[in-house]
Amino acid sequence: MRKKIILAFLLVLVIFFINEQDITAKADDGVTVFYDSLAKNTDNEGNIDSLLRILNSMGERVMMYSWNENPDLSETSKIIILQNKQADLPDKWVQRLKDSKAKFAYIGGNPPAFLADKLQLKTEAVTNAAVTIRTNNGLIGKPQLVADTNLITSYKGTGFGEINTAEKGSSPYGVQSENYAYAPIFQANNASEFALVDVLRALFGTKEETNQYALITGVNPFADFNMLKKTADTFYEKGIPFVVSAGPVFYNSDFTAAKNYAEILRYVQAKNGTILMNVPAVTYGASPAGELENIIQKSVHFFADNDVAALGVTAELYWNFDKVYSTEGFAPFNSGILLPNEKIIYTTKKNNGNAFEKSPFSITSDFYGTMSGQMNFPLDIAITYPFFNSEKELKAAVNQLADENISDFRLQTNEVKTVQDTIESNAGSLYINDQAIMLDSDLKYLKTKKMETQKQAGSLEGFFSYQNTFFTIVIVLSLGIIGILFIFGYRLYMKKYMK
């Protein structure tokens, strides 16, 4: 009897602990985003991906659904509706949102009546108008032609930013009061991205971060090392800290080509360059459990073993919504930058994404160049440049950044932790496995054999391509065996019946 009582008591404790863990998880459930359309071939195309990257940079985990889905909203504390079509929000959603206790932002042309009542909202429609958007801090975008949008003419609460038109003058970009917010327009690659951040920060109560970083992508073992050295020297001479997205090495790491790659990255590191590891190139949408995790850990160890402190990760946005990539690929890193999608190859797509502790919002240098006014961004940004192909491109980038307040990524607290290695930065110092790194700007290249370079190239083509090669070999061998059996059987058949 006594044993039964003890077992029952332990069972109650376990159930209580599980429930408490579940409650904790639900209390920090992130943001639920609903959208009606991907807005292909319209002015709004790309705004969903932009919103997802913005929320990640704000430190928000995301659950994403289309209007046709029917998820449980009972535990959701933050909701964003993104309307790209002209159609109104379905009635079933209007009632559910009206009954919800969540903080709620509506983006688009037709806010539901209950939201208009809550915000005492009145709007005026404009079509084919040139508009200029300004943020709360005075950041101004270039004028753009908008097919149709609303201008807010009356509201309750706090107004954020401005939309200016030649015909109608200025009106607030967005408004917020208590648990409700509204913005009439949101597009990728214009000032509405940052104007919306002001509205969402006020609604969700999140802290503003305002660092600006310079990010150079496309660095890998096959980049022009002389150009990379020139880049590091030029940025260093101009006093501009920078971040390099460096491709991984996970096979043939003892080859001379790999060692020389590590050598140039050490040089970059000594010239105020921060190294982030870019994820492996994906060529095939499948991966056995643990394969990517092993590759990421090997790649981190290659850098660590060569005194290169990779302080975070870079990847296209879709990695954050893939069951394998987001878990095995991102697990070691507390810092990362999500880049716009270029070529999407999922293993298995999922509708929820995680958030890095630190994740600057990547914008192209061309887009950055269109902004004017007070260059105060409401979230951390990474002004992103592809690897420079010429000194002319390098000079243009340095001139663009020369008078800007560019931050040093190493001044933040970053941590990368695998089974084998721990890499950290603290107040500008770099540590690998609790040992401070001595920054060394002496280049000690080793002679590279052509054969080794070619082998290394094969090892870095893409970590899923090996499966393609394996399956191709299996299929060819199988067809060969079938052919041999067919010929053998045919001869037996002919021998039997010819007699």
Which residue stretches match the model-derived regions?
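Active-site beta->alpha N-cap acidic-glycine motif
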Residues: 187-192, 196-269, 282
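C-terminal single-pass membrane-anchor helix
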Residues: 440-499
